[in-house]
Design a protein with these regions (language model features):
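ATP-binding glycine-rich phosphate-binding loop
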Residues: 12-57, 79-80, 91
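Conserved C-terminal segment of Hanks-type protein kinase catalytic domains
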Residues: 296-302
Length: 302
């Protein structure tokens, strides 16, 4: 398969699936980013992502992903939980320019669920039980991804979608860290989101850093804390001298409101940590206290 150095949707005449040469036509544009554009297609249940710059490395990474998908833990519920690349897409010259992926319908971005004001407006029926169910389903999905050796790397709440039944879907999966099990080549996740980067990765150059699922454990714990409490665990009322450090510095120092000798305490009118089941509380303490100096002690997604 040949790979063109760049691709412009306006220049496109024909797209075909790499696996069987089935024609694919693009419909309405539904999202755009620095990497590429996501389109509706003529294939029921599928979207296409077309890259602005489909580099050799990007396409090789996709080939590994297409050939080794994770098990979808929600298939028995007739729900797409992982918007995984399903097939490469070629243009009329045979160059790979993007990929097909399953569409996730009738779902909201995670912040509209964990933010109390947005939840009241957009999902008033989402109660304490549904928030727990969403957290559990998120952990199941991440466990399935880890089981295949993948690392999410950059967890954006906007890339986790939730429907009215608390069923979860992860999108933007082509940004994950991928390891080719045959060659050992690692296709890294080169970016990170503020507030979701564990202490041992702060200041690291992600383009040359191999990540592990241990790093994802911190990210998952932050995400679940957002879901159950509505705010970031490394936030609250600063009790030290001077102005409160920014969130990245609080993570670096291990200052969260449940930490020993922490200079952060819960803000007024926030939900206390001990309101959740003792086992969930133990997981948070294990992750943010013990895991600060010994990352391998963070609870796994499983």
């Amino acid at each position: 398969m040949t790979i063109k150095p760049c691709f412009c949707a306006a220049m496109m005449t024909i797209l075909t699936r790499a696996s069987n040469n089935q024609p694919v036509s693009l419909g309405k544009q539904i999202a755009s980013s620095g990497e590429g554009v996501v389109w509706e297609t003529n294939l029921s249940g599928y979207l296409a992502k077309i890259y602005h710059d489909p580099t050799v490395e990007r396409i090789k990474k996709l080939e590994v992903m297409v050939g080794n998908p994770p098990a979808d833990p929600m298939l028995s519920r007739n729900h797409i939980a992982i918007a995984w690349p399903d097939d490469l897409l070629k243009d009329g010259s045979g160059a790979a320019v993007g990929f097909l992926m399953p569409a996730v319908r009738q779902s909201r971005e995670l912040p509209s669920i964990y933010n109390p004001r947005l939840r009241k407006r957009n999902a008033p029926g989402f109660n304490w039980y549904y928030l727990h169910a969403t957290a559990l389903n998120t952990a199941w999905i991440i466990q399935a991804i880890h089981a295949k050796g993948y690392v999410l790397g950059d967890i954006k709440p906007q890339n986790i979608l939730v429907n009215d039944s608390a069923l979860v879907a992860v999108i933007d999966t082509d940004s994950f860290q991928v390891r080719d099990l045959q060659t050992g080549q690692v296709y890294r996740c080169t970016v990170g989101s503020e507030g979701f980067t564990p202490v041992e990765l702060l200041g690291k150059d992600f383009s040359v850093t191999d990540q592990t699922e241990i790093h994802d454990r911190f990210r998952l714990a932050v995400m679940i804390h957002y879901l159950l409490f509505g705010y970031h665990p490394f936030s609250g009322e600063w009790t030290g001298s001077g102005e409160s450090p920014d969130q990245t510095e609080l993570i670096r120092k291990g200052f969260w409101y449940g930490g020993q000798n922490s200079l952060i305490r819960p803000s007024q009118n926030t939900i206390p940590l001990d309101v959740v089941h003792p086992e969930i509380e133990r997981c948070f303490l294990k992750c943010f206290n013990d895991g600060h100096t010994a990352p391998h002690l963070r609870p796994t997604a499983e």
